[in-house]
């Protein structure tokens, strides 16, 4: 019973209670995708090898169904991202906010995702990770380098009128997965757009 209550608390706090969702975790290698997935699954922080093959985690408790796909971020793994776009409910795109030298590469991949017709109406949560590092980019700096200044939809509820408004929910949240900061707010925001 304790385990059920614990999982309920985690998912309810993320706004995913009584919802079913297929979520892709994307981003360059070393951005924190696998670490985030394991923190969401069992609040465990462990060292991970780079993800070589796509993995998925499915949590199902009561009426909660949450399926997350962790697709590797290295250049070869990015080639299979497109294979997972079908019937996806949301994309969580992670960026290493400390690795400023890779911002242009991350922007290129994000631009490709945002311009793909298969993802045209899919909400995007962009997480700037590793803000526990004092030299990590600020939210404004990350928005600028990703070309998202004045492009995001806001951290409040965006009215999408049943998906007909042409507005794709897209927002940036800064986080530190290892310190368990910021990503919860991002998932609460994202949950508004998962039916």
Swiss-Prot record:
GO-annotated cellular components: COPII vesicle coat; endoplasmic reticulum exit site; endoplasmic reticulum membrane; Golgi cisterna membrane
Subcellular location per UniProt equals:
Endoplasmic reticulum membrane; Golgi apparatus, Golgi stack membrane
A GO molecular function term, named singly, is: metal ion binding
**Where GTP is bound, by residue?**
30, 32-35, 129-130, 132, 177
Q: Where is GDP bound in this sequence?
A: 30-35, 53, 129-130, 132, 177
The record's tissue-specificity note reads: Expressed in most tissues.
UniProt-listed Enzyme Commission number(s): 3.6.5.2
Q: How is its activity regulated?
A: Small GTPases activation is mediated by guanine exchange factors (GEF), while inactivation through hydrolysis of the bound GTP is stimulated by GTPase activating proteins (GAP).
**Motif STAR: where in chain:** 2-4
State the superkingdom.
Answer: Eukaryota
Q: Which SMART domains match?
A: ARF, SAR
Membrane-related topology note: Peripheral membrane protein
Q: What is its main location?
A: endoplasmic reticulum
Please list the residues that bind Mg(2+).
29, 70
Indicate whether GTP-binding appears among the record's keywords: yes
Gene3D superfamilies cross-referenced by the UniProt entry: P-loop containing nucleotide triphosphate hydrolases (3.40.50.300)
**Catalytic reaction equation(s):** GTP + H2O = GDP + phosphate + H(+)
Q: Does the keyword GTP-binding apply?
A: yes
| Annotated Pfam families | Arf
Which family does the entry's similarity section mention?
Belongs to the small GTPase superfamily. SAR1 family.
Assembly mode = Homodimer; upon association with membrane. Part of the coat protein complex II/COPII, composed of SEC23/24 and SEC13/31 heterodimers, that it helps recruit and assemble on endoplasmic reticulum (ER) membranes at ER exit site.
Q: What does this protein do?
A: Small GTPase that cycles between an active GTP-bound and an inactive GDP-bound state and mainly functions in vesicle-mediated endoplasmic reticulum (ER) to Golgi transport. The active GTP-bound form inserts into the endoplasmic reticulum membrane where it recruits the remainder of the coat protein complex II/COPII. The coat protein complex II assembling and polymerizing on endoplasmic reticulum membrane is responsible for both the sorting of cargos and the deformation and budding of membranes into vesicles destined to the Golgi.
Q: Which PANTHER family match?
A: RE74312P (PTHR45684)
Q: Which NCBIfam families match?
A: small_GTP (TIGR00231)
The protein's name is: Small COPII coat GTPase SAR1B
Name of the encoding gene: SAR1B
């Amino acid at each position: 019973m304790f385990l059920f209550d614990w999982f309920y608390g985690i998912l309810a706090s993320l706004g995913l209670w009584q919802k079913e969702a297929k979520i892709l975790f994307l981003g360059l290698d070393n951005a924190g995708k696998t670490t985030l997935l394991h923190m969401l699954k069992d609040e465990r922080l462990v060292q991970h090898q780079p993800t070589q093959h796509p993995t998925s985690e499915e949590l199902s408790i009561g009426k909660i169904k949450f399926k997350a796909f962790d697709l590797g971020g290295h250049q070869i793994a990015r080639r299979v991202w497109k294979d997972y776009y079908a019937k996806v409910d949301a994309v969580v795109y992670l960026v290493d906010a400390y690795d400023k030298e890779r911002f242009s590469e991350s922007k290129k991949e994000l631009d490709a995702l945002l311009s793909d017709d298969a993802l045209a109406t899919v909400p995007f949560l962009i997480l700037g990770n590793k803000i526990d590092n004092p030299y990590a980019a600020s939210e404004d700096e990350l928005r600028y380098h990703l070309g998202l200044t004045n492009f995001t939809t806001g951290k409040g509820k965006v009215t999408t009128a049943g998906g007909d408004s042409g507005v794709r929910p897209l927002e940036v949240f800064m986080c530190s997965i290892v310190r368990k900061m910021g990503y919860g707010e991002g998932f609460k925001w994202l949950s508004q757009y998962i039916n």
